[in-house]
Every structure is written in structure tokens, then in C-alpha cells.
Amino acid sequence: MARNTAINRYRNIGICAHVDAGKTTTTERILFYTGLSHKMGEVHDGAATTDWMVQEQERGITITSAAITTFWEGSRRQYDKYRVNVIDTPGHVDFTIEVERSLRVLDGAVVVFCGTSGVEPQSETVWRQANKYGVPRIVYVNKMDRQGANFLRVVGQIKNRLGHTPVPIQIAIGAEENFEGQVDLIKMKAIYWNDDDKGTTYREEEIPAELVDLANEWRSNMVEAAAEASEELMNKYLEEGDLSAEDIKAGLRARTLASEIVPAVCGSSFKNKGVPLVLDAVIDFLPAPTEIPAIKGIHPDLADKPKEQMEESDYDERHADDNEPFSALAFKIATDPFVGTLTFVRVYSGVLESGQSVINSVKGKKERVGRMVQMHANQRDEIKEVRAGDIAALIGMKDVTTGETLCDPDKPIILERMDFPEPVISVAVEPKTKADQEKMGIALGKLAQEDPSFRVKTDEETGQTIISGMGELHLDILVDRMKREFNVEANIGKPQVSYRETITKDSVEIEGKFVRQSGGRGQFGHCWIRFSAPDVDDKGNITEGLVFTNEVVGGVVPKEYIPAIQKGIEEQMKNGVVAGYPLIGLKATVFDGSYHDVDSNEMAFKIAASMATKQLAQKGGGKVLEPIMKVEVVTPEDYMGDVMGDLNRRRGLIQGMEDSVSGKVIRAEVPLGEMFGYATDVRSMSQGRASYSMEFSKYAEAPSNIVEALVKKQG
């Protein structure tokens, strides 16, 4: 079967933003204008098409990234048909994992900002994540009809706060209730939207006299930005003093794909003024799958090789080409009440037909692909095949987790994995009735499979089930989903902070010896280990996990016992050395020891290594670390003193303050343990007028009174 749409006419894009910048409404309008949805859903009446989980509709925030396939021929039917796969991403800090995993599989992004509040904390997080994956993007400043909206002020904030170069290709005509449309700086025409067809079409007129000078100023800024794309364009510009519309688009496109600039447009999705031009900008400036670098991967045999030891020759590439071996990345798992598990994949290369088998190269397991569907929010169309560049959902996968690779069994590859943050908050859950115990286990297992930033474990001492996640809202919603989707009522304990431990000494040599010899077969394990504190980067982030090396010479400890020593260290790291919390990172080198011909075995060496690791509390300068959150509070000036005093009482460090449309923005770093229930406190302090957001920043040493309490608790 041939391709319906040439791959150079694919656009895989995400719509990212801060909560309430109007992202879901923008996605709704995209569905409407691309002809998929005949009734526009409004978020505030709980009817938006992409917000298809019950809680999303109730809370008015987007939680899961729904992937939608649409087609676009241009606001003036000026293009051949393009296939646009849109992923709607959540903007709430507790769901950054959803944003991260969507950005991983996208080729370009539309970042939506509110015309009034501009660059908000979460926008910075999303921007950093897009930088991390090198995602080219365009900016859409929405809500231009709102009080205090100002397009060029937001453009300035993007430059100053995000350190990127925005290039407006429009300016706004009017603002707030007088917002009428845009000046198209490429055509130098004023654009006014037709209310009769809900802003599907527009008329072009001359630019209003009072905006001509401003339009000329920003046009020359745009033309210069385009000219800098190449020597050829620069020479043309210097000779002729201007560039044609084609040259401007080509220059801006080249620089956007290189992530040097960000084209900026404005509008009001709610008032139906501007979204078709956002779609035009997606076609004009964002990349096709063939215009981004080929994805890299490694052969499954090299899966255990440490990243720092990898050589260029260890990597393999997959290009966006139907003739290459099939490879795809599972970026989301969702449970559907009718068909079971949906595995959302981004296909990077090759072709897959339903009924064929693929291999999950991470687990080494074969999977048969039953049915395949293309999603339109929560409706689905069955398809017979997927090709390079496609985003689709596979039905019938038995054992696939987010971030794993599905590929051709004859040409296996493990594509670059996603990094998932460690949870920072835990609560105990127990079913309200004994009968729900088993159901709760199944429900939590399914939710953990869908969301890698959510963990479930059983506390060995208390037998309680502990769930961990990225914030209070994250866990609230998962407990809520358990109730709605699996009919499991649960009681929730008090939130617990995920403390960590580390050591501070840079080189300490410790002996571990485990000997039991009393007639018959005994136990003998003896090793010397040099422990060092983990590496810390400029921002205070600690290298996680164990970096283990073997420097034993002369066979004083036989080779077959070395993995047992590593295992013993790793197991003790999980249980901590000071107060029972996991060691965040450690460097360990085994360099000496001894063995017994008869009594030595793996278990003895594992215990010896564990005993050596335990001594780090005293000998290695063991410390307890607490998670520190980056907190941003937006408050009217009247309540600023109270808010700051309260943050100080919570052991917060004020990092800075600035003015915003809604008052003052206070930025601080506060220990997570002091932030429980903050939502209620900050509301009562400000009579409901202050809002805040927080995200994980780093781990830092906990004060001695907290450590004492934790050690006491451990008994």
C-alpha cells in the first residue's frame, strides 16, 4: 500500500504551555478548522475533545496527552494537503513527565503563552525540556482579548527570561476588548477575521495608519533575521534592501529548524481570531520528520554498557524512511475501557502492518501487533499499517512500558531512552474494604505501567502499600482515577517526603568481612572497598546510582565474586546508612580482599560488601538530603509581606522578586517537607487571590533536627 501523504508533508507537533494559557482551547480550534470537529468544545463547559478523562473535564486542566491526526491545506488553501499529528500536553507542574515524553517524540512544538501573564514558571520548565530534546518551536501569544494583554511585552519576556530570540511575523491590531486581528508582516496586510464562519476565513485590508511605523520597524527586524540564514540571502538583502515573501519564509524556516530563532504570532483562540495562521506557521516553519537528525540507538547486546564508555561506532541510526528496518518508540500507555491497553508509538523508520510481529528490544520479547488505530482525541479509526513519521496506537501489546523500543526482530535496535525523574512525594494507601485489596493491586499496576513517574511499592516493615509521585496533585488524581476507572475506594495516609542519603568524604577505604566457620560448609567473604562521594555538577545536581569499578589484581578475589560485591553495595544503598533512606549516588572501587577455597560463595561476598557499605554512616561522613522545590508565588502587593514571612518560616530562601500584571512574583527555594498543605495556607493568607506553582529543584543537606527526628523514627 502506498503512502497517502508524502513524508515531507508530515508535521508531528506538540502544543505546550503553562496551565491556563489556553492550550486546550487552541487544540480544539485546530480540530475545528481542520474539519475534524463540528462543534467546538470549550474547556470551561467541560466539553473539550482532547480532555477526555473525566477528571480533566471536571478540573479544566489537561492531564494526558491525547494524540490526534488532522489534515491542513492552509488558511487560503495555498498548500497541498499536509498531515498534522498534534499532541496536546499538560501544563501543570505535576505532569511534566507527560510533557517530557511527548517532546521526546515530536519534531516541532507550538508554545502557547497568555497575552496577559506572559512567561510563567511552567513555561520555563517546558522551554528547558524543549531545549533538551532540541525541538524547533514557534510561539503563539494567545488571549489577546484579555485585560492587560500585550503581544510585544510577552515577546520581550521570551527574550529576557528564556534567553531565546523571538521573531514576530505579526503584530496585534488593538488589544483587550479592542483586539481586532493581526498585521501580517510578511505580506504587510491587516487581517480581520469573519465572525460568521467562526474565524475560518479572513479579509485582508491596508494596515491602519497608526500602526504603519510599528509594522515597518518589526518587518525590518524580521527581514534581517531571515537574511542571517545564509550568505546568499544576506547579499540579496544588502543589494535590494528587502527580501521576497518566499525568501523571508525560507530564511526564517532554516533558522527555526536550527533553533536559532522562534517565529512569534498572536491571536485569541477563544474569540476565533488567529488559529488558522498558527497552523500556516506550523507548515511554514516547523520540520518534517525528514528534516530532523536521524534518531540514534544501540544494539541490545550493548544495553548494559555504561554511557560514558560508549564509542561512536557503538551507535546505529534510523532515518525517516519507509525502506529502513522498522523502529518505533512507545511514548505512552493508556488503558481503554473497550479495547484494553493502547500503546502509543512514534514510528521512526520502516513500515509495520497489523498482524506482524515486532520485538521489544529492551526486554528481548516478541510482540504480535493485533490492531492499529489512529486517534482523534477519544475517537479512533482502525488502520492497516503505519509508516515512518506516523503516530498511532497499537492494541494487544502484552508487556511494553513507556520509553521502550519496538523494532524489526531481524534488525534490533534500542532507541535513545527517555529520562524519568525520581518521585519526590509518597503516601500510604489502603483499600477501604478487604475485598478491594486485589483490585487495588491491579489498578495500581496498570497506572504505574502508564506513568513512569508514578511508583508503587510495599513497605516491608509495615506491609503498607506506598505510592510515590511528582506532587500532591499528581497523587490526588491517580487515587481519583483508581476510584473512577477501577471502582476501588482507598484511604490515603499523610504525605511523606522522599529523603535521600549521600556521603561527603572523597576517598575512604573500608573493610568488609563476613566469616562463619563452625564445622561443615561455612561462609567466607572478605573485601576492601574504596568509597567516594558522587560527582556534583555546577547546579548542585548529584550523579545518581552506583559507579562501580574493579581494581583487584592477582586474583585475591576471584572474578566470579565481583558482581556479588557490586550487588551487596547496591542493596545496601537502597536501605541507606544513616536513617534508612536510599543513597542517591556513590562511587565504589573494590581493590583487595581474600577468599577461602571451600567456604567462599557469592552470598558471603554480597554480605561482606553490604557490611562495608553500612560503615559509611561513620567513616564516610553520611548525610541525609531533603528535596528542595523551586516555588513561585504570584500575589497582589498587599499580601506580599505575609507571603514572604510565611516562606521564611518554612525555611525558604527568597531568590528574587519581580512585577507582574497580577501583582508581585516571588521566587524561592523551599524544602518539600515544609510545603504540605501550602495551597490552602496561601489562599487563606491572600483571601484566595495568590497562586503558586512549584517543581523539584535539587537535593540539599537536611538540618540536624530533621535528621535526628528521622533517625529516631527508624528506631
Swiss-Prot record:
Its main location: cytoplasm. GTP binds at residues 17-24, 88-92, 142-145. It is found in: Cytoplasm. Keywords: Cytoplasm, Elongation factor, GTP-binding, Nucleotide-binding, Protein biosynthesis. GO terms for biological process: ribosome disassembly. GO terms for cellular component: cytoplasm. Residues 8-290 form the tr-type G domain. Pfam families: EFG_C, EFG_III, EFG_IV, GTP_EFTU, GTP_EFTU_D2. Belongs to the TRAFAC class translation factor GTPase superfamily. Classic translation factor GTPase family. EF-G/EF-2 subfamily. Catalyzes the GTP-dependent ribosomal translocation step during translation elongation. During this step, the ribosome changes from the pre-translocational (PRE) to the post-translocational (POST) state as the newly formed A-site-bound peptidyl-tRNA and P-site-bound deacylated tRNA move to the P and E sites, respectively. Catalyzes the coordinated movement of the two tRNA molecules, the mRNA and conformational changes in the ribosome. HAMAP family: EF_G_EF_2_B. This is Elongation factor G. The lineage of its organism: Bacteria, Pseudomonadati, Pseudomonadota, Gammaproteobacteria, Pseudomonadales. The gene is fusA.
